[in-house]
Amino acid sequence: MTPAEIAPKDRLIVALDLPSVDAAEAMIARLGDSVTFYKIGYRLAYAGGLPLVARLADKGKKVFLDLKLHDIGNTVAQGVESITRLGATFLTVHAYPQTMKGAVEGRGGSNLKILAVTVLTSYNEDDLHAAGFRLGVAELVEARAQQAQVLGIDGLVSSPEEVGALRKIVGHQMSLVTPGIRPAGSASGDQKRIMTPGRAITAGADYLVVGRPVVEAAEPKAIADAIQAEIGQALGA
């Protein structure tokens, strides 16, 4: 699917960063037909949320399984092979060469798309230097993107700040997925490299991941609808 073929409604991925399956299912019910794509991360996955992937798929929803796998290639390959049976659309791995290579091997001929996480959106230059990286955020993101493209990764996860540069590097051959999205007036929380939905889409993002601004809202459906409307405006839809 080319970027032009992605409907505005399908570009919003709501992060179900909730404490239980019951809480997640209640949120899904409140959002109804407004949301077609959900993210399941550590918190929900380890609270019994993995079977929810298949249940959502049966309802025609898509699931982004955000597990950020990072291990030796063989272990990742075996894990990803098992994950292909869950019915998820996207799966994240960290953008290290052995990890990415193993994920592509484990995916095989399935429909699962592998996304490489470049640099977490909670990191800035100081955090990278403290962790021993000599490259800055932009340089490291671009280097990892180039490696991911060579290894056959389907898409990249980065902050919206790097999307424009990444689009120039990978063209439209890879999907660009951006967390760190905050509607105007929302608290940034623990995110350090953030952007509004419209600006992120204009910069070149294909999919936007939004969690707390939606799931912690008094009226989550209204917030999701507003974000999708902003996406549509940015696309000229």
UniProtKB/Swiss-Prot annotation:
Subunit structure: Homodimer.
Key words of the record: Decarboxylase, Lyase, Pyrimidine biosynthesis
Protein name: Orotidine 5'-phosphate decarboxylase
Entry-linked SUPFAM superfamilies: Ribulose-phoshate binding barrel (SSF51366)
Reactions performed catalytically: orotidine 5'-phosphate + H(+) = UMP + CO2
Pfam family, one: OMPdecase
Pathway membership: Pyrimidine metabolism; UMP biosynthesis via de novo pathway; UMP from orotate: step 2/2
Record-linked NCBIfam families: PRK00230.1 (NF001273), pyrF (TIGR01740)
GO molecular function: orotidine-5'-phosphate decarboxylase activity
GO BP annotations listed: 'de novo' pyrimidine nucleobase biosynthetic process; 'de novo' UMP biosynthetic process
Summary of the function given for this chain in its UniProt record: Catalyzes the decarboxylation of orotidine 5'-monophosphate (OMP) to uridine 5'-monophosphate (UMP).
Annotated GO CC locations: cytosol
Residues bound to substrate: 17, 39, 66-75, 121, 182, 191, 211-212
HAMAP family: OMPdecase_type1_B (MF_01200_B)
Gene (UniProt): pyrF
